[in-house]
From Swiss-Prot:
Protein name: Putative acyl carrier protein, mitochondrial
Carrier domain mapped to chain residues: 33-109
Pfam families for the chain: PP-binding (PF00550)
GO biological process: [2Fe-2S] cluster assembly; fatty acid biosynthetic process
InterPro entries according to UniProt: ACP, ACP-like_sf, PP-bd_ACP, Ppantetheine_attach_site
Task performed by this protein: Carrier of the growing fatty acid chain in fatty acid biosynthesis. May be involved in the synthesis of very-long-chain fatty acids.
A GO MF term: acyl carrier activity
Amino acid sequence: MLSRFSSQLRFISAVRPVIPKFQPLRFYSVARPDAEKRILKVVSSFDKIQDPKKVTPTSTFANDLGLDSLDAVEVVMAIEEEFSIQIPDKDADEITSVGDAISYITKNPEAK
């Protein structure tokens, strides 16, 4: 009787459970084209921008758009509101162009 079960036991011991490997993935909340479009819209609609056609992904706030540092802070705050995130002051100080804002948003997984 034991021999009858021994063949089944060998089969059962040969079967190993399948454990899926964890593969880390990085998910971005906002795709770059969507982030670019939304940021361009936010910056273009800012009151102190006199020519919205000058707003491009390569525009700098101070040189190309004529914004002072307080205006740049207001633009960053508008971007925070648009994407429902809080940008730390240290990071906000480094956002000096539309391109910087786009890069920051696409790298931030909390952006919506």
